[in-house]
Amino acid sequence: MAKQRISLTLEEELLDKVDSEAGRKNLNRSQMMEEIVQDYLSSQGLDTAVVFCGGEQAQSMEIHEGKPVLSHVLDHLTGEEIDRIILLSGSNQEEIENHFGSSYRGAAIEYFEESEPQGTAKALSKTGERIGKTFLAVNGNVLTDVDVEDMLKVHRDEGNIATMALTTVENPSEYGVVKLKGRTILGFEEKPDPGAEPSRLINAGTYIFEPEIFSQLDAEGLDTVFEHLTSDRNLSGYIYGGKWKDTR
């Protein structure tokens, strides 16, 4: 990853402490400052999640194992210490809001309704003023138990605008298959012929985004946005081997 030179103005006493710690670790001042910043960022977890509940995810209120699919999704998010949830809905907003209200298991719920279907990317773009930091996004019709903290670590290690959780399936030809090199997603192949798949990895429907993503959201769907990110080598892949079920 390319580095840039910056200048900082610190109190002399604080700088002495930095130099002392750098000497103890046999680092120069620049290396020590980088380590301090990295440690701080790594300690900051995610607290905001966007859930796609409209369009193709409109089945999120269908019953699965005794309760709406969306309830299972929110159970996972709150279990991962998410305390702010933004639900992007469509014509199903009234049903969702009547069921969940303004909070769920201690997490505040906000609603954003698409008056007309405009695609996932367009819907997400309208939440930009509400989100000013790294955030999680999930498909409201997919059940997973992705370790968000571990995924966030990979996201920060790679330093890209977005990270996509990936899972393996037995029938990859029925999905869009991911081409991956290391942790960098190179592209996608939509429903390849059986036996000709470049991998068994598919999009698991869980994402981590930096706020810079909002400047990319001028397309009709996230698939197009992801294609742009792969062209710029700005999309990371997080391979995930836990529970995964598309309820559509």
Over which residues does each language-model region extend?
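A short, conserved acidic/glycine-rich loop-to-beta-strand motif
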Residues: E158-T168
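Conserved beta-strand termini and adjacent loop/short-helix elements that scaffold enzyme active sites
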Residues: G90, F112-E114, A165, Y238-G241
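Catalytic-core segments of class I nucleotidyltransferases/pyrophosphorylases
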Residues: R24, L136, L143, E149-R156, ...
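Conserved N-terminal catalytic core of the sugar/cofactor nucleotidyltransferase
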Residues: A2-R5, L15-D16, S20-K25, S30-Q57, ...
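A structural signal for short hydrophobic beta-strand segments in well-ordered beta-sheet cores
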Residues: V177-L180, G237
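A short, conserved beta-strand element in the Rossmann-like catalytic core
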Residues: T9, V142-D145
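A conserved hydrophobic position in a structured secondary element of the catalytic/binding core
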Residues: L10, S91, V138, L180, ...
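Short beta-strand/turn micro-motifs composed of small residues
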Residues: L10, C53, S89, L166-T167
